[in-house]
Amino acid sequence: MLLESDTQLNQKSYYEASVLRRAPEPALAGALSADVLVVGAGFAGLSAAIELAQQGLSVVVLEADRVCSGASGRNGGQAIVGFSSGQAPFEQQLGMSDARLAWDMTIEAIALIDERIARFGIECDRVAGYLYVADSARKARLLENDMKILQRDYGFASEFASGTDTQRLIGSQRYCAAAFEPVSGHLHPLKYGLALADAARSLGVRIFEHSAVQAIERGATLLARTAAGRVTAKFAVLAGNCTLREHGPHVAPEITPRIMPVGTYMVATAPLDPALCRRLIPSNASACDNNFILDYFRFSADHRMLFGGGVSYSTMTPRRLAQTMGARMCQVFPELKGVPLDYVWGGFVDISMNRAPDFGRLGDNLYYLQGFSGHGVALTGLAGRLVAQAVAGQAARFDVFARLQHRQFPGGVLFRTPSLVLGTLYHRLRDLL
């Protein structure tokens, strides 16, 4: 059901409509061998493949659908420093020294995007700048305090505005405070992801689409099986996230209960007057509020408002999605009332229980990357670099994340959704305050 809903939700994606995909890669047939097998051709898997190939290793990537057909190719396009969890899990579990190291690596994650754009000549509408916004006095105080802590403990500076001064940063009466920082930003995720695949191919990586991994036999040499083929490898990286279990429930059953698929949705308006765009977001930054149920938005290169928000813990496609998302958008920007919505889409992302990324090993040679929790545009690139370093025997930075403890969702895989819905109802009420 999840895979069917995911495909259905992505049929009217602005991103898919604004790129020209190459012909599909063939499905795996027969037997292959490689130094490293990567499962999943999203940002994390492709990033790992690039880094591994740059080390001179032979790499095979198996993708169950098409390159970046999942969360990597249809997200908000916001490349953000930090973690969805905030710094608390890192400070509490690892101490301030490693918490600072983890934070600094998220700065590196943004730089890595720009490094790859420059090296491989990627055109993906990259724009720098990010706005955090708050819609109540309580949340404005929280935002200001968070920014002060980042400045004090991590040396990360931002520009804070409140009251009427907020309008200088964002042209919406809904918000009473905003913080701008120039490091994060936004891009066209599918353009970026398809270009990463091209970069991987240029380095000799072999990519197979429509090649879901159904099982992996573990040992000193790993053996992965698909419907029509098999791959033997010295190492493997699992980067399928919330769809990994759907294709191969027995591939890694010990880690799949630690993440949960959550539906999130977006709309794209018809192209707007550039002057209106400058009035609504003068810096052309991407933006996100600090509610538990987020609204996030930005402008595309062709002057469309791309507005995302809402979550669903069901695999069913929500009814009246266009009307619901359009209403949310117009609550933020009433000027957009009556503007046509040319595209409406959505799909599933993975979240961890504590919203911190979940990286680790299953034995000595099977690695996994999951739990990006809405910060995947930047963190997936970092994850790929770290896991490649670990495969090469330089695991210190990977192990900063691997030492984080992650709990399973209450109720396990089958009954985790009702438990999370109950918790979310509380936070929905908090968002109103």
What are these regions (language model features)?
Residues 1-36, 54:
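Extreme N-terminal leader/targeting segments of oxidoreductases
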Residues 111, 119-127, 213, 221, ...:
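Active-site substrate-recognition segment that forms the wall
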Residues 315-432:
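C-terminal catalytic lobe of FAD-dependent flavoproteins
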Residues 2-18, 85-91, 115-129, 133-195:
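Flavin (FAD/FMN) cofactor-binding and adjacent substrate-gating region
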Residues 74-104:
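Glycine-rich active-site loop/strand segments that organize a redox cofactor
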Residues 34-61:
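N-terminal Rossmann-like FAD-binding beta1-loop-alpha1 element of flavoenzymes
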Residues 54-74:
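Glycine-rich FAD pyrophosphate-binding loop
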Residues 148-149, 174-235:
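Helical element adjacent to the flavin cofactor pocket in flavoenzyme catalytic cores
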